[in-house]
Amino acid sequence: MRDECLRIPHPSSLIPQKMSRGKRFSSMMRGSIGGMRRVAGYATNKVRARRVRKREERSRELTRVNGARRVVITGIGAITCLGLSLQETWDAMVAGKSGIGPVTRFDASHLPVRIAGEIKGFDASKYIDQKELRRTARVSHVAVAAAQEAYLASGLEIGKDVQHDRVGVVMGTAMGGFEMSESALADLRIGPRKMNPFALPAALPNAPGHHISKVCGAKGVLSTVVAACASGTQSIGDAAEMIRRGKADAMFAGGVEAVINESALAGFALMRVLSTNNENPEGAQRPFDITRNGFVYSEGCVVMMLESLEVARGRGAHIYAEVLGLGVSSDAYHIAIPDPTGSGAVRAMQWAIEDAGVRPEDVDYVNAHGSATETNDPLETKAIKLVFGERAYDIPVSSTKSMTGHAMGASGSIEALATVMSLKTGILTPTINLNTPDPECDLDYVPNVARKDDIQVAVSNSFGLGGQNASIVLARYEE
């Protein structure tokens, strides 16, 4: 099955460096003393006791504070409007580049919004054969491509390092294969026989997870998170929980969105949440700026390979970061407007920190939801202050969406990528286009230029339509 995931060369820049394996504990046997056979049983018991103590020490070393298994990230794959790999995406983030431009997928000249964060130069045929291409939606093509990169980068061999049924998939999406449903409806108007018989299954939200599972031979847990803009974040946290609880040893996890079409763009425009700065696409997404006027709709996918620390260490895997905890809450307020008190966002962050077994004072970076809407940015700022108190002013906060736009169900996983790489490299990605700060948004948003900072523990936020809130705590991996 692994061969099916090796159809394209792995980018040299992403080949993981092998880490030296830790020294294994060796048992120390003592002989009988002075031929005193009568104490042999006692000596044997002492040896057994030492072995038990060593096993217990090793178990504690590989266990989180709350008694569950530790979960680490060993591979990351990315297809975004910034690039077609982890390295391309990360380099663009550090450089503060925008992935926003004019819509090219269709003629948007009649719409009030004509800009988006499109994936550029993606060739699905490199990852999926022609027969499957006709039967699947673009969202699945992008997901499979990102999953293959994550799998290759991890160095994991399913079927050798872990059994097929101990590897699962949790993918998040908001829109799924929405465009396939539209295409089927258009064909139906011509005649029922014109419809693609695979259109409906291709449009299902769980289709991306299915195709990752099929291509990579992951026969364990298969789950799909449909939680609007919080989908990608929650999927990573849910996958980590499966490993912690012993339901899996490794998981593919992430978020995907690949629906930039006429109805999606028109629909969000009617909600008045999109930026109409068509003349300046790269400067259109302006989180925390007083001149912000909405987000830019975009697409993308990030998939991460999660493993139990025991499995990752056992095979000498390269480790990017550790997943510590997840917090999920509901505003129970309005499907399209966040609770003005910010209480839902506060609960998500607090519960994530509690689940991680750390304290608020341990957190030294926040990757914000930062959607650049009129209501979200001051509310998120308020929520961060409520969670961290006066210390909030000392914590750097940045919005990846300033560069990527809002990729809906994929946004959380893209921002998790940024957070993981910030933890690993000590470089914080900037909030670009922040030139005139909103007085209500008065935190340190890492404006316009990346910054070096030796962070250890970070929170990444995703707050979505339907009052869906998800926060995840990630940490630098320490031996």
Give the ranges of each region predicted by the language model.
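Phosphate/pyrophosphate-binding loops at sites that engage ATP/ADP/AMP, CoA/4′-phosphopantetheine
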Residues: 150-163, 311-319, 349-365, 387, ...
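Compositionally biased, intrinsically disordered low-complexity segments enriched in Pro/Arg/Gln/His
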Residues: 9-16
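Active-site-proximal alpha-helical scaffold in enzymes
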Residues: 143-156, 205-209, 213-257, 295-317, ...
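Active-site-adjacent elements of ketosynthase-type condensing enzymes
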Residues: 108, 112-118, 176-180, 258-285, ...
